[in-house]
């Protein structure tokens, strides 16, 4: 299975090798389970106040610090950004998970990258125009075809993991109708393995069971 698979993919003139595919942590904002469009990336600094730039058709690079994540992301979304990349302001290669109830109401995908990558990306944007980025998740897909046609009440999925950090694991289930259940997501528990679990979802209520589940 891919590990550390959430990436910011950068395209532009002579992109440094260290910026082509930047590892990122997700947030409690919408998760890019499918790749986002490649959008021109704009550095908006700290985003302490409402952003006056028109970010429609663009993505925002935001520096951590002084105000909370949810406010920064709200400003980016209000300016029209398609997604946001928040860069750390300390810690070198350290990354944080942008969690919390307020962040869950952010309408755009948002990820967090480390200070070293973020500073290099900001400098690259300063020196080059037309730089684009997209969010992409490296993932393994298992397919299960159900031939019985039943009306779904709830779904149970048993999964077994061999991974030392449950914090890293994201597990989703997509029905033939296209409804996605998030069964396990990134979290702050970095000290224990996930092992084997039964996951339950009622998001597929009244859907047909027949077809391919992934």
Regions found by a protein language model. Give the residues of each.
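Structured lumen-facing ectodomains of secretory-pathway proteins
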Residues: 1-146
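Loop and turn regions of beta-sandwich accessory domains that flank beta-strands and are enriched
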Residues: 1-2, 138-214
């Amino acid at each position: 299975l891919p590990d550390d698979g959430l990436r910011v993919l950068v395209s532009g003139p002579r992109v440094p090798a260290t910026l082509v595919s930047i590892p990122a942590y997700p947030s409690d904002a919408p998760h890019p389970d499918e790749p986002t469009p490649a959008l021109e990336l704009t550095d908006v600094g700290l985003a302490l106040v409402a952003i006056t730039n028109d970010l429609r058709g663009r993505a925002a690079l935001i520096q951590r610090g002084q105000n909370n994540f949810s406010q920064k992301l709200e400003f980016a979304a209000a300016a029209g950004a398609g997604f946001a990349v928040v860069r750390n302001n300390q810690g070198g290669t350290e990354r944080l998970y942008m969690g919390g109830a307020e962040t869950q109401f952010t309408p755009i995908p948002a990820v967090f990258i480390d200070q070293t990558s973020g500073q290099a990306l900001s400098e690259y944007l300063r020196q080059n125009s037309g730089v684009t980025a997209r969010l992409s998740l490296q993932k393994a897909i298992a397919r299960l075809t159900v031939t019985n046609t039943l009306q779904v009440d709830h779904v149970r999925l048993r999964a077994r993991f061999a991974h030392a950090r449950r914090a890293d694991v994201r597990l989703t289930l997509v029905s033939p109708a296209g409804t996605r259940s998030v069964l396990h997501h990134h979290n702050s528990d970095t000290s224990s393995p996930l092992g084997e679990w039964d996951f339950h979802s009622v998001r597929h209520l009244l859907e047909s069971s027949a077809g391919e589940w992934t």
